[in-house]
Amino acid sequence: MHTRAIYPGTFDPITNGHVDLIERAAKLFKHVTIGIAANPSKQPRFTLEERVELVNRVTAHLDNVDVVGFSGLLVDFAKEQKASVLVRGLRAVSDFEYEFQLANMNRRLSPDLESVFLTPAEENSFISSTLVKEVALHGGDVSQFVHPEVAAALAAKLTSINT
């Protein structure tokens, strides 16, 4: 029985689509660790510490979820966390090929680590952190795509960058 899962990502920022998947994963597994990747190649707007804090605030209502920042190989992080399942989201068919390659690589590196794919609710299927940042950068209202605390943090971040 798989009791511990990891939902990895950059979460820059966490969106309603992410939260939807986290809430559903929390119903499927005894414990879910949200692994926030340092991933310097993505040049995130928020620091790792800021992303961990935002995700902690947005998921505080889930007793069986914790949030941990990490760097390095995901399979190593999964071993450290004693997780046997990776949860990944698929928004569209276009996500599948990349996720399929990742799942196969992770299986090769760690044969006991299973990948489970969840699809978001229809109203969240088009939301991505990249699109949210783009809308916010151009002054658009992102409140329907992210938690209010995330919207405020994003507005503050963009204000500090533009001043």
From Swiss-Prot:
Designated name of the protein: Phosphopantetheine adenylyltransferase
UniProt main location, coarse: cytoplasm
Broad class of enzyme this protein falls into: transferase
GO biological process assignments: coenzyme A biosynthetic process
Keyword Chloroplast: no
Pathway: Cofactor biosynthesis; coenzyme A biosynthesis; CoA from (R)-pantothenate: step 4/5
Alphabetical list of HAMAP family matching this protein: PPAT_bact
Taxonomic source organism: Shewanella putrefaciens (strain CN-32 / ATCC BAA-453)
PANTHER family (UniProt xref): PHOSPHOPANTETHEINE ADENYLYLTRANSFERASE
Classification via Gene3D superfamilies: HUPs
Similarity comment text for this entry: Belongs to the bacterial CoaD family.
Binding site for substrate: T10, K42, L74, R88
EC number: 2.7.7.3
Lineage, highest ranks first: Bacteria, Pseudomonadati, Pseudomonadota, Gammaproteobacteria, Alteromonadales
Binding site for ATP: T10, F11, H18, G89, L90, R91, E99, N124, S125, F126, I127, S128, S129, T130
Record's catalysed reaction(s): (R)-4'-phosphopantetheine + ATP + H(+) = 3'-dephospho-CoA + diphosphate
UniProt keyword Hydrolase present: no
NCBIfam families: coaD_prev_kdtB (TIGR01510), cyt_tran_rel (TIGR00125)
Keywords (A to Z) from UniProt: ATP-binding, Coenzyme A biosynthesis, Cytoplasm, Magnesium, Nucleotide-binding, Nucleotidyltransferase, Transferase
Cellular localization per UniProt: Cytoplasm
Required cofactor names: Mg(2+)
One GO cellular component, as annotated: cytoplasm
InterPro entries: Cyt_trans-like, PPAT, Rossmann-like_a/b/a_fold
